[in-house]
């Protein structure tokens, strides 16, 4: 790959000297989509991602406009060729279908993570370590000033809040991003035996999760009493 296996092209990351963009927002001829959060989504001529990510992206963006846009689903740990490149996806542990990408060319491997979570999750595939020579990592909270409590502590606090609210005879309300965080909370509570109701926007995402094997059978839609 030479000295710089990755480059900026029109403000987007691209594998040097190729058409393969990484989580591009602007339309590209070919792009890898690590996951379906809005800050990574774009409409491209060809999109490489896991089947779950492609389904979530279609749910969020709608069908391709004017018939443009080819979805190229790829399975984890299954190398495939793209021109002179060999690509392989690995779970990223961020949300359902999230993936890291390993790009090999001329014996040199580039690793690109997108958002990455190495802690155990309730509703996403567990992250794996991929071997590479050059690693490009998204680090939203990479600065040392960001210090969060351990995840088990946070989950215990959520459960304590829910129990306290129910003991007081009131309905506990939890807020979370509609894709990812909401399903983590709902799956955690459902597995603990709580019956939950989800906002219709969250419920629509839940259906995609369920279609890809994440059991959310105790999660019911909440009928809105007013427009949202």
Where are these regions (language model features)?
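Long, charge-dense
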Residues: 197-214
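Divalent-metal (often Zn2+) His-rich catalytic cores of metallo-beta-lactamase-fold enzymes
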Residues: 173-192, 201
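Short, charged/polar "capping" segments at the starts of alpha-helices
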Residues: 54-58, 184, 203-208
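Short hydrophobic/aromatic-enriched beta-strand-loop microsegments
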Residues: 67-74, 193-201
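His/Asp/Glu-rich metal-coordinating catalytic cores
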Residues: 2-26, 30, 36-175, 180
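Short, solvent-exposed amphipathic alpha-helical segments in soluble enzyme
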Residues: 37, 127-129, 188-193, 213-214
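Single conserved hydrophobic/aromatic residue that forms the stacking wall/gate
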Residues: 219-228
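The feature marks the mature, well-folded catalytic cores of soluble enzymes
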Residues: 156, 166, 195, 213-219
